[in-house]
Amino acid sequence: MRGYDDSVVKHRKKKRKLSSGFFYLLLVLSGILFLYTFYKMPMFPLKWTIIVGAVLLVILLITGFFTVKLRPTNLFQKTVNLLLAVVLCATGILLPYEESKITALFESVTGTTTLIHVYAMSDTYKTAHPDYFNDDNTIWTDGASGKQILQDYSDYLIYGTVVKVDRDNQNYCINQLNNMCHTIIQTLDHSSLENAVKDLYVNTTDVLIMSDTYAKVIEDIPGYETFGSDTVILDSFEREIESDFNLIGSSDVADQPFIVFFGGNDQTGSLSLQGRTDVDMLVAVNPKSGQIAIINLPRDSYIPNPDYDGSYDKLTHLGITGLDNTLRGISNLIGTEMKNYVLVNFDTFQTIIGALGGITLDNPYEFTAMDGQHYAEGTIDLDPNQALMYVRERYSLPGGDFDRNMHQQLVMQGIIRKITSPEGIIHFNDILDNVKDCILTNVSSRSIYSLVAKQLDEDIDWNIVKYHVEGEMGMEECASAPGQLLSVVYPYDSQIQFVSGVIDDVFAGEIMTQQQLPEGSFE
């Protein structure tokens, strides 16, 4: 009797094999999951959801027909149903993952930090200048810990400061040093960076407190070009910097005009909202009319600095006290409020170009850069190093700094072309992985999604006009670097008024045509 019962059990087990109908049910459930996920993705317009839903319905009808007509045990039909179910499930899971990466890229940064360094002259420099440095008046580092030196000699060190120039960072560092050394440090304040650095070089002060954003300013001063190699950093303090501007969170950007500042600061390493801007580009966009205006301002434009009570300064220097200050200064200059930004620096710019696999652009003339790199006239391909030099070079260009602004616009076009090319779309996932942490922005992912959805829905044929403002060269004292004459550009009033009008026209929905900038003149 037991043998008979065993055969019955085996027979019943065979009957319980999964049929093609079961796999079809999995396919239907996977299709519903996928369609719901696709519908919830903010970058896809409703029209695309309807199209995808229609295609999916056709697939389900065809597979359903063969599932009914063929035997339930048909291996081919079961395999087809299973494979389609797996593909739909995997895609339904992958879409939210990709969305989360984009969201992280555009929303992970709302503020950043700045570094304040404590500088001292290097032992090598001290040894080479015995007139100022000797064993009786000098503290030698001899490879010792910088922090230990500051603590051990806290009663003797004189700290050079420039509170007038960089109040918040200077006071923050002084307080940190007081706490670290358990004493009130001795300071000698200066009216200008140049005077503070001079006293460090001649041993009037032992150390200098200065934000790293000012190091490039110092190296622009004649006689201090080697400041970076002449000094050592004994210690550094990190201070949190918060932007006054919130994320652009509204989906209204798909229907309302907006303007974004694209800046490139001249620092290496990690990004910071404090630093000089080598690139000062305004991009005005009207999604309804499909108009874009790209406007470059000379980095050395001599304009009022809001953080110095409107005293005149280089545009590039406004960012030293924070990008918010740059945006306020530009807003006052062009008469349109600037509150949205995208910021990169030298290192992150190269990372972005590398992630794209280089870019292609149309170079209007042949030139050789100061580092020896040659750029032919016509269509050229640029790797990350070549692209960086292309947007930085100015001395070997016919129009100097003004032609550099044009180069920056050409590179921006090259980036846009590469991102929207088939190759860029295929490698979009790799690009996202590589450019993470390469930008600082207050543009939210919701804004990006709404623009992408509008582009996919309407296939907008964008009309782009480009202008780079020019001016006359001169030498002036700057608010952020008092006591020294620096090279500046007086931007032409006539051209500032013209580009301000262009921005107004974009916002008004006018159809733009590329025009010549008016002749330069001042009011």
Sequence positions of predicted segments:
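Membrane-interface motif at the C-terminal end of an N-terminal transmembrane signal
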Residues: 40, 89-107
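Terminal targeting segments of Actinobacterial cell-envelope proteins
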Residues: 1-16
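Internal/C-terminal transmembrane anchor helices
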Residues: 74-97
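Membrane-embedded alpha-helical segments of integral membrane proteins
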Residues: 18-67
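Cytoplasmic membrane-interface regions of multi-pass membrane proteins
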Residues: 66-75
